[in-house]
Amino acid sequence: MFDLEYQLKNLPDKPGVYLMKNNLGEIIYVGKAKILKNRVRQYFQKSQKHSEKVKAMVKNIEEFEYIITDSEIEALILECNLIKKYRPKYNILLKDDKHYPFIKVTLAEDFPRVVSTRKVTKDGSKYFGPYVDGSSVKDIIELIKKTFPIRTCKKNIVEGAKAIRPCLNYQIGLCKAPCAQYIKKSEYREIIDDVIKLLSGKHLDIVENFKLNMERAAENLEFEKAAMLRDKINIIEKIGEKQKIILNNFDNEDYISLYSDGKDTCFQVFFLRNGKIVGREHFIIEDTFDTNSSTLISNFLKEFYGGTAYIPKTIYVPNIEDEALLEQWLTLKKESKSTIKIPIKGEKKNILVLVEKNAKTTLENFKLKYLQEKALYDNVLKDLKNILRLQEEPIRIEAFDISNIQGFDSVGSMVVFEKGRAKPSDYRRFKINTVKGADDYKSMKEILTRRFQHGLSEIKSIQDRKLEFSSGKFSVFPDLILMDGGKGQINIALEVLNTFNIDIPVCGMVKDNKHRTRGLIYNGEEIIINKYGSVMKFITRVQDEVHRFAISYHRSLRGKNSFHSLLDDIPNIGEKRKKDLLFNFKSIDNIKKATYEELLSIPSMDKKSAECVLEFFK
């Protein structure tokens, strides 16, 4: 039994991290403190004026634990790591934990490549970015590949190594084939230097050089070469237009502000690179209530920059808590100086005002759309409750479907809708294990049995404090089950539920002869729902989604299996021998018919491997 009063009295006079837990043992909040005893006790002092969010959290605190650290900066680093690990309910959590893409030039390699990455490391490479729009990175890299003959393979190519046969890219002029040692390291590096110039905003120098070569080619009547250079000039100029870059000797700035309406908050981030706004991002955090803006921004910075690969040179905010500590943390992460500034007037202040205005507009538009959707979904759930005569509105709905082709690779899918909205994070896939051939009823029985067995097992683990509630994949049960089928599928579901003594209403979604949603089957009778337009659309959407999810899983399994060959199952037949056998015999059937002598005639085959093939196909 946790003795709250005793634990509060014995809190240490040291820096550290505290973890608040609810009655299920779940971590609902992680915080850091300069002095643990002062900070943790504040939550339980009635004299303290807490925000509504903190009051709601304190009501749910059943116990807490703490970790002592040597310094406040260590506590901050640990706090960020624990928030990322546990995703506590009452911490500010960004639903979109983005790592923005960069263009990476792998300068540590003898023959560098140009690739996209979301992780910046000290590996000797040169990075350009981040790019808020991922498609821009893809477009720029594709244009670079068309313009500069650089390699795209992942091979470890070293100058002076054994030459290998070049790929098709060499044949069509897209690569200089360093793998075949057709180009020296120094010559290849000259090409890479041009790529770096282009990505560094110095494309005009390259264009000038290409124009001179184009004019020379035209004077020498080499019109094809001149046309090719003209096309490359157009591509380079296009990259120059697209390229919004980071240069180490220019200002790289993020502007962060927020707007709160008393309940929810919208954070808006503007990214400025080389004096230009190259992108923006917003994050809406619900139920912040009356938490002060400096606390919100401090918590937002920890979450946002804890999950991004790039930290700018300067971050501008309207106000903030723990400014010096956060600067120290950002500098440690960046491995070079990063500064937080609060502008009072001038251009920087004006940009922050613009950022706040955008946050306000974004939140208002979100609320308007949310309220419209909420009203629509509320009506759908009310109508569904009335149509089926349910006791409560079906807040959580689970739908199930089976997919197979002629009995092969049977799979099951479960999709979830909460409050009328799809909840992909709760979707589940099942590979059928116990059923041979195409038997949808037995397959459905298997996946439903597994779903509720897992659920009951998780609930017991949660009750025994062996599993956190938020970690459960099946512990939340639905208010309504929708089966993609008629009475047969409904009966299977009811049979499984009765086995586990679970009482959940089950509906069947039926289609007409044109495979369009027709109605629902419930309690043995069909209910026509076409007069309920919004319900009809909702059921159709659920039916289409569960079918799509099942089909996509089935295709992915088929795709994996399509790469498997019978030859993979033969002992002593590796990738090389498999390729040689198929190249010489053209098909599996011909390999089956091959004699011992014919198999041995393949250079990579020996007596043992030939015997293995004959034994396998005997």
Swiss-Prot record:
Pfam families: GIY-YIG, HHH_2, UVR, UvrC_RNaseH, UvrC_RNaseH_dom. Keywords: Cytoplasm, DNA damage, DNA excision, DNA repair, Excision nuclease, SOS response. One of its GO terms (molecular function) is DNA binding. One of its GO terms (cellular component) is cytoplasm. Signal peptide: none annotated. GO terms for biological process: nucleotide-excision repair; SOS response. SMART domains: GIYc (SM00465). Coiled coil: none annotated. Residues 13-92 form the GIY-YIG domain. CDD domains: GIY-YIG_UvrC_Cho. InterPro entries: DisA/LigA_HHH (IPR041663), GIY-YIG_endonuc (IPR000305), GIY-YIG_endonuc_sf (IPR035901), GIY-YIG_UvrC_Cho (IPR047296), RuvA_2-like (IPR010994), UVR_dom (IPR001943), UVR_dom_sf (IPR036876), UvrABC_protein_C (IPR050066). It is found in: Cytoplasm. PROSITE patterns: GIY_YIG, UVR, UVRC. Residues 204-239 form the UVR domain. The UvrABC repair system catalyzes the recognition and processing of DNA lesions. UvrC both incises the 5' and 3' sides of the lesion. The N-terminal half is responsible for the 3' incision and the C-terminal half is responsible for the 5' incision. Belongs to the UvrC family. Interacts with UvrB in an incision complex. This is UvrABC system protein C. It comes from Clostridium botulinum (strain Langeland / NCTC 10281 / Type F).
